[in-house]
């Protein structure tokens, strides 16, 4: 056992000593971050997660300690004892400890380090693959340590907040019954039940509802969830969410609790006061103005739906718009203020950008002094009446640029939504990453309960089948499911969905009608959800809840560029762990015990 560990105890971290500590004898533990040998004195910057402290080993004070310090190299793990001394005129303003240094009287090397594959510095140009391969070294870097400490603080604040409000932190199973549909599950074979599989829970949804039916009326959990999906910048196969459920509530009660949490986190972590209540926007308005249900409201540039205008003008001399309307598509425009000076090259780049999302092109018009359109193929055929109507609808002014999309509704929404954000970044309205100092929270409410699956010819739940429909829309469950809106809500921040939830169905008869609207037979419903249907018949209370994505929340709080920067041990976009080599092969004996056989044949 190291002498320093048994005989001495750490007195301070490497980031807390100040001039108030001058004259004190201290014991520090950490890693050698930097080393400078000036002959008669060796200087090191000693690092731990709290910061850096300069330590001096002087030959004329302790020759033996100075000699040992001569062996130090970067990333050696050491213990140091010494006296805190003023740095006089050599203050380092970049360090919290920059007014002092420690003159060492004792040193112990706990462990040596081989040369690291990259520098342990704030900014490095090492590729992500190398950093993930040596993640334990990457995590020694101050930016990642600050991020994970912020994450720990968010965990702590969240637990205290909900506990103070009378919530119980309760656990739910990870290994659950597999049910087809929804997200693709990770499967776990059961050795004791040959041929049977568990699924790793994609969320605690059903179990937290069952807690409500069991009488635990306020539940929360910071929980791991698993989804075997294609990965993106903001996805990981295993992720963490702040999961919440409450009995005897309507959606305003959920909003009140969750806004309180968010306001507390922003105040305690960033020192920022977030005003409440948060803005609310119907789903239909969000789609019309912004093309998606997670709009970034830090800047303006809303879309304008022109479908009715084009219909009223019978196409207005623009055949492609006319055809889109006749085919039950939509026509949208977006006014880009004072941007008529965009060059042809810039416009061409925008057109290539939208084509990459499935658009056939990018119609545009530059607005002149008299409202005329220039540098636009549309200007040749559009009627003056439709042009004037579009200018008025878009509130177009001379010098503005109008951009158009028309065609299939889903494509137009997606293209225009992404184009809006792309232009905002290009124009400097928002930064590429981070908040830019602006925080625009929004509840998107009242979405459709169902969406039509053209492939199967069936209505499917837009989120899940346990969401309560609006009472006024129950009449449409059998006749026109597309008209049924529901008590679902998403919490959006700066263009990211950070949480979503709903008021749940607690009436077994309405639940059965929802299943039938989705084409789910009584037998199928009982096979998949029999336990829940039985519980609904046993005095289930009105209840609702929400889940916030912890990883995404921390990503936004810290200004990180991706979720991989806020997860300690992330997977790559292929779902692999470059450090451990997971996923890996399993020996044949264990597969036989699990009654599993691989049919994969390498190409």
From Swiss-Prot:
Gene label: aspS
GO MF annotations in UniProt: aspartate-tRNA ligase activity; aspartate-tRNA(Asn) ligase activity; ATP binding; nucleic acid binding
Highest taxon of the lineage: Bacteria
Record-linked InterPro entries: Aa-tRNA-synt_II, aa-tRNA-synth_II, aa-tRNA-synth_II/BPL/LPL, Asp-tRNA-ligase_1, Asp-tRNA-ligase_1_N, Asp/Asn-tRNA-synth_IIb, AspRS_core, GAD-like_sf
Keywords assigned by UniProt, alphabetized: Aminoacyl-tRNA synthetase, ATP-binding, Cytoplasm, Ligase, Nucleotide-binding, Protein biosynthesis
Taxonomic source organism: Anaeromyxobacter dehalogenans (strain 2CP-1 / ATCC BAA-258)
GO cellular component: cytoplasm
Localisation: Cytoplasm
Recorded catalytic activity of this chain's protein: tRNA(Asx) + L-aspartate + ATP = L-aspartyl-tRNA(Asx) + AMP + diphosphate
Binding site for L-aspartate: 227, 463, 504
Record site: Important for tRNA non-discrimination: 38, 89
EC number of the protein: 6.1.1.23
Principal subcellular localization: cytoplasm
Single GO BP term: aspartyl-tRNA aminoacylation
HAMAP family xrefs: Asp_tRNA_synth_type1 (MF_00044)
Functional summary from the UniProt entry: Aspartyl-tRNA synthetase with relaxed tRNA specificity since it is able to aspartylate not only its cognate tRNA(Asp) but also tRNA(Asn). Reaction proceeds in two steps: L-aspartate is first activated by ATP to form Asp-AMP and then transferred to the acceptor end of tRNA(Asp/Asn).
Protein name (record): Aspartate--tRNA(Asp/Asn) ligase
Positions of the UniProt region annotated as Aspartate: 205-208
UniProt-listed PROSITE patterns: AA_TRNA_LIGASE_II
Family: Belongs to the class-II aminoacyl-tRNA synthetase family. Type 1 subfamily.
Residues reported to bind ATP: 227-229, 236, 497, 549-552
Assembly: Homodimer.
């Amino acid at each position: 056992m190291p002498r320093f560990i048994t005989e001495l105890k750490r007195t301070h971290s490497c980031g807390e000593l100040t001039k108030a500590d001058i004259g004190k004898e201290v014991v520090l533990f950490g890693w050698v971050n930097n080393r400078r040998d000036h002959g008669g004195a060796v200087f090191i910057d000693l690092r731990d997660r709290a910061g850096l402290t300069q330590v001096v080993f002087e030959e004329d004070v302790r020759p033996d300690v100075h000699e040992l310090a001569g062996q130090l190299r970067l990333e050696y793990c050491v213990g140091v004892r010494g006296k805190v001394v003023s740095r006089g005129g050599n203050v380092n303003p970049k360090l919290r400890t920059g007014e002092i240094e420690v003159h060492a009287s004792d040193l112990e090397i706990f462990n040596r380090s081989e040369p690291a594959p990259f520098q342990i510095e704030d900014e490095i140009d090492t590729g992500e693959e190398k950093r993930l391969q040596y993640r334990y070294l990457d995590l020694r870097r101050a930016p990642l340590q600050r991020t994970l400490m912020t994450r720990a603080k968010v965990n702590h604040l969240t637990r205290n907040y909900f506990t103070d409000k009378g919530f119980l932190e309760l656990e739910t199973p990870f290994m659950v019954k597999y049910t087809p549909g929804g997200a693709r599950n990770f499967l776990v074979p059961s050795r004791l039940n040959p041929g049977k599989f568990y699924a790793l829970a994609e969320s605690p949804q059903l179990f937290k509802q069952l807690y409500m039916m069991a009488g635990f009326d306020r539940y929360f959990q910071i929980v791991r969830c698993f989804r075997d999906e294609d990965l993106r910048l903001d996805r990981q196969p295993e992720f963490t969410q702040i999961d919440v459920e409450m009995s005897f509530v309507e959606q305003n009660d959920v909003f009140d609790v969750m806004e309180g949490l968010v306001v507390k986190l922003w105040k305690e972590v960033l020192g920022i006061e977030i005003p409440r209540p948060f803005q609310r926007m119907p789903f239909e308005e969000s789609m019309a103005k912004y093309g998606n249900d997670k709009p970034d409201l830090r800047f303006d540039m809303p879309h304008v739906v022109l479908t009715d205008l084009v219909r009223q003008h019978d196409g207005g001399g623009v055949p492609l718009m006319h055809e889109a309307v006749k085919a039950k598509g939509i026509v949208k425009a977006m006014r880009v203020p004072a941007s008529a000076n965009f060059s042809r090259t810039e416009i061409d780049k925008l057109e290539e950008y939208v084509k990459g999302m499935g658009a056939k092109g990018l119609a545009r018009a530059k607005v002149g002094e008299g409202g005329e359109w220039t540098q636009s193929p549309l200007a040749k055929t559009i009627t003056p009446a439709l042009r004037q109507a579009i200018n008025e609808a878009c509130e177009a002014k001379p010098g503005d640029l109008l951009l158009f999309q028309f065609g299939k509704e889903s494509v137009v929404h997606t293209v225009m939504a992404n184009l809006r954000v792309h232009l905002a970044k290009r124009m400097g309205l928002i930064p590429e990453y981070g908040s830019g100092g602006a925080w625009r929270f929004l509840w998107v409410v009242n979405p459709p309960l169902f969406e039509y699956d053209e492939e199967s010819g069936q209505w499917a739940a837009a989120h899940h089948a346990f969401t309560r429909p609006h009472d006024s829309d129950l009449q449409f469950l059998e006749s026109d499911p597309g008209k049924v809106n529901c008590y679902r809500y998403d919490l959006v921040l700066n263009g990211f969905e950070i949480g979503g939830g709903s008021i749940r169905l607690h009436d077994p008869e309405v639940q059965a009608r929802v299943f039938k609207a989705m084409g789910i037979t009584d037998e199928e419903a009982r096979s998949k959800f029999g336990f829940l249907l039985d519980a609904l018949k046993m005095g289930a209370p009105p209840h609702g809840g929400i889940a916030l994505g912890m990883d995404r929340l921390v990503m936004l709080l810290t200004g990180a560029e991706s979720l991989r920067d806020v997860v300690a041990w992330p997977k790559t976009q292929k779902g692999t762990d470059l450090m451990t080599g997971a996923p890996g092969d399993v020996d044949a004996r264990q597969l036989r015990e699990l009654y599993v056989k691989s049919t994969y044949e390498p190409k």
